[in-house]
């Protein structure tokens, strides 16, 4: 009820605060028998963690995950899995000057009016640090889906600020700090260096895709696969928009173009983004998210204090000038959690369903 749990059959309860002793999650519903070690999870956490380049926050957290329960002799037991990530590099004194003021664009004002109190240190529960446990949970989902169906997830940065990034190759993504699918990122580095010197921030657009998704995942009406994907992506800090498939470009398309024609060898296009009627087609799930500029910047801005008086706010501390730089593994994780949830639902309800029509995407593969 408090909004800290994502999913039902694969339920992930997120806990902790940015400057508390630890953050983490409890996964309830992971099938038993999955070989799982901390190393399986750490790979994705390392992709998301702070302090990895000059273009992200310099808060130096190792984000080392600890498996506290739900795994015995290297395999999941089917009972709740508790994953813990200790906070080691908090610097709460940086927030002393904003205890009685509200940062524009941040959750300070809304949290205070909801709860009657707030934790200003790093944003408390509103901090993007709380995405780390979701990345950890997503790594578990990714592993199960890969072994069960051969499903894989990957993402990249498609735009940063006003710079559109053309897609060249997935091979480039892990080779630069931006998750950019291009060989040369010097122009992105120059852009971010200038932005940091100006004391400002920028937004980003992230593309994430899932391949090898079984056909038939998703439910009619209110539990559509694409509806749950949008819900999951909007749960990521700073996300302000979600597109699936052609997204808003569908407005300018015509039916002769937008409808994905079928052939015995597979679909001829993927404007639907891998979902028709809320149910997966077996094509790649194609999702894009829009991320707003970081709210915490050192440029003075107009605000009010807790008494309602005018105030000028300057946010000190260590912050990402573009939170989108580290968002790619987060978006991958949330997509994996949605696919995992619906895979378990499909297995529970329709495991015995057979149809005579061939699965054209599997046949092609």
Curated annotation (Swiss-Prot):
It catalyses: 5-O-(1-carboxyvinyl)-3-phosphoshikimate = chorismate + phosphate. One of its GO terms (biological process) is aromatic amino acid family biosynthetic process. Pathway: Metabolic intermediate biosynthesis; chorismate biosynthesis; chorismate from D-erythrose 4-phosphate and phosphoenolpyruvate: step 7/7. FMN binds at residues 125-127, 237-238, 277, 292-296, 318. It comes from the Bacteria. One of its GO terms (cellular component) is cytosol. GO terms for molecular function: chorismate synthase activity; FMN binding. Keywords: Amino-acid biosynthesis, Aromatic amino acid biosynthesis, FAD, Flavoprotein, FMN, Lyase, NADP. PROSITE patterns: CHORISMATE_SYNTHASE_1, CHORISMATE_SYNTHASE_2, CHORISMATE_SYNTHASE_3. NCBIfam families: aroC, PRK05382.1. This is Chorismate synthase. It comes from Polaromonas sp. (strain JS666 / ATCC BAA-500). The lineage of its organism: Bacteria, Pseudomonadati, Pseudomonadota, Betaproteobacteria, Burkholderiales.
């Amino acid at each position: 009820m408090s909004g800290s749990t994502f999913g039902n059959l694969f339920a992930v309860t997120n806990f902790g605060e940015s400057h508390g002793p630890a953050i983490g999650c409890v996964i309830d519903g992971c099938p038993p028998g999955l070989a799982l070690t901390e190393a399986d999870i750490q790979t994705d956490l390392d992709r998301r963690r702070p302090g990895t380049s000059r273009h992200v926050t310099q808060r130096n957290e190792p984000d080392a995950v600890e498996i506290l329960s739900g795994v015995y002799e290297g395999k999941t037991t089917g009972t709740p899995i508790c994953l813990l990530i200790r906070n080691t590099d908090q610097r709460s004194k940086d927030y002393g000057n904003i205890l009685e003021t509200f940062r524009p664009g941040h959750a300070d004002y809304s949290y205070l009016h909801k709860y009657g109190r707030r934790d200003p240190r790093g944003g408390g529960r509103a901090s993007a640090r709380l995405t780390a446990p979701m990345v950890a949970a997503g790594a578990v989902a990714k592993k199960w889906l890969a072994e069960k169906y051969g499903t894989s997830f990957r993402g990249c940065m498609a735009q940063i600020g006003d710079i559109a990034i053309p897609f060249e190759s997935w091979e480039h993504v892990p080779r630069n700090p931006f998750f950019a699918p291009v060989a040369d990122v010097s122009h992105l580095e120059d852009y971010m260096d200038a932005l940091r010197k100006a004391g400002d921030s920028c937004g980003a657009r992230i593309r994430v895709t899932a391949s090898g998704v079984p056909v038939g995942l998703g439910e009619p009406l209110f539990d559509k696969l694409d509806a749950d994907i949008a819900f999951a992506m909007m749960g990521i800090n700073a996300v302000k928009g979600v597109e699936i498939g052609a997204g808003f470009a569908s407005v300018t398309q015509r039916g002769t173009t937008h409808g994905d024609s079928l052939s015995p060898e597979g679909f001829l296009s993927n404007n639907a983004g891998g979902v028709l009627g809320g149910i997966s087609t077996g094509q790649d799930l194609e999702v894009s998210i829009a991320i707003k500029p970081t709210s915490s910047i050192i440029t003075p801005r107009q605000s009010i204090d807790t008494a309602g008086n005018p105030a000028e706010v300057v946010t000190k501390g260590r912050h990402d000038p573009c939170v989108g730089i580290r968002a790619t593994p987060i978006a991958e994780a949330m997509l994996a959690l949605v696919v995992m949830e619906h895979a378990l639902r499909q297995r529970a309800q329709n495991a015995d369903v057979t149809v005579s029509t061939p699965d054209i995407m599997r046949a092609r593969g």
